[in-house]
Amino acid sequence: MTALSRSNYAALFGPTTGDRIRLADTDLLIEITEDRSGGPELAGDEAVFGGGKVLRESMGQGRATRADGAPDTVITGAVILDHWGIIKADIGIRDGRIVAIGKAGNPDIMSGVHPDLVVGPSTEIIAGNGRILTAGAIDCHVHLICPQIMDEALGGGITTIIGGGTGPAEGTKATTVTPGAWHLARMLESLDSWPMNIVLLGKGNTVSADSMWEQLRGGAAGFKLHEDWGTTPAAIDACLTVCDAAGVQAAIHTDTLNEMGFVEDTLAAIGGRSIHAYHTEGAGGGHAPDIITVAGHPNVLPSSTNPTRPHTVNTLDEHLDMLMVCHHLKPSVPEDLAFAESRIRPSTIAAEDLLHDIGAISMIGSDAQAMGRIGEVVMRTWQTAHVMKRRRGALEGDGSGKNGADNLRARRYVAKYTICPAVAHGLDHEIGSVEVGKLADLVLWEPAFFGVRPHAVIKGGMIAWAAMGDANASIPTPQPVLPRPMFGAAPAAAAATSVHFVAPQAIEDGLAERIDVRRKLVAVKDVRKVGKAQMPLNDALPRIEVEPDTFTVRIDGEVWDEQPAAELPMAQRYFLF
């Protein structure tokens, strides 16, 4: 029997069980816990494509037709990083959905082939060997200010956006709201052309139940309560009353100035009901200085936006100018300046790092063009994980020492932009993880570029975005290699591989017949019983206290000191600008 060293095996087929992979230039390492595609248990039967390799006629490729159940696409030998684990496997895709995770090939001559991974003449191959596969990212906080954000989102590995807007209107620049049935219809039609799942939020700042039901029938999948529209206790209660009846989620940006009440009053108005708290730390807005305390409540689903991720020596300086622009404020007006300065507190931004690391803040979004960068959701998440490993060391249950694996930490952080927002907004029956039955919204990463630039973004089973060289070159790889749209990004393909998530009431009311869209409308699941306990690996409920005068933060009684990072991975090493 021929023996292969681990290094030679990894060069041929990719890493296997027990091998560790560094994520970009961070200090984070992940370890493969199982190899379903080869490795120690199935060595010699790996499915690999290429000249002189396995997946050829009457060898690794069998005779199974599509009618026999052959997959449309197989991703070979990828390392799956998801909230449920870190394994290596072949992934089968059929009709735009994941059909199997296991061993692909030809069962006539190969052992252990999964019955739904029988490679036939109708099967395309994407080489995942040596690469990391994650679920497409979900940006849970998007201002739809300009259509160009779609390209930036795809280029950052995002395949679903949750938010609202109508373009560069003042309401949209400040709030993630698509108000009213007419705007909802036009935005659903406009967004039909991009390879991106869409979740639009209607305006929840009203005590008019009729207005909110009208928006749900018009295509809203939930609501946004924003202080710039007046997040009063009465509006909070009215919005959540409709949400409870409809089964949809509400996202909230609370009252920074405490004009309508304090954080305790907002929590009283919420009344123990499920709610998604945007930018829970507060620099993006919310009760000053203690909105961060809501992350300790079991009914509140807290998220961050990426401009404060992680806390660095530059975070405070850039925030003041961003805030003035985003909320239509003027530096020359003292009251406007005081409003802005009250929101930016280094102590709460620093505490936000720790709350992410212990799993108390469950999600990360962008706040795109409204104090955040849509293309940096994934990158900022992993920068935070790196900073926390350097400061706190390995999590309990992870490996110790310089080369110890960080599997728990990696699974916790990937969940923040995949499964957690999917669960929070009732999307997890369709997206949010690499699991059988879900849409094949997947991202392949070269380990050296993990979290920075995807190798390929697969949307509903089609490659929609990829790193690609000069189109006039003789091969695909000559420089400049840039993230570029692929055939899956064409409007007709995008409509076939993406969905609009809407409230069940919209489907029941015949919205599909009233608007000009080609893609499928999918009802969100009932989320009214979703609480922090349903946030995978991000369900911690610490006691959080903020001193009103000094802004000192205590988490479970201990002060978390400010130590802003002066250097980050995944930064200038990868970018010219």
Swiss-Prot record:
Ranges where the Urease domain occurs: 136-577
Origin species: Mycolicibacterium smegmatis (strain ATCC 700084 / mc(2)155) (Mycobacterium smegmatis)
GO annotation terms (biological process): urea catabolic process
Name of the protein: Urease subunit alpha
Record PTM N6-carboxylysine, positions in chain: K224
Entry superkingdom: Bacteria
Modification(s) after translation: Carboxylation allows a single lysine to coordinate two nickel ions.
Residues that, per the record, bind Ni(2+) 1: H141, H143, K224, D367
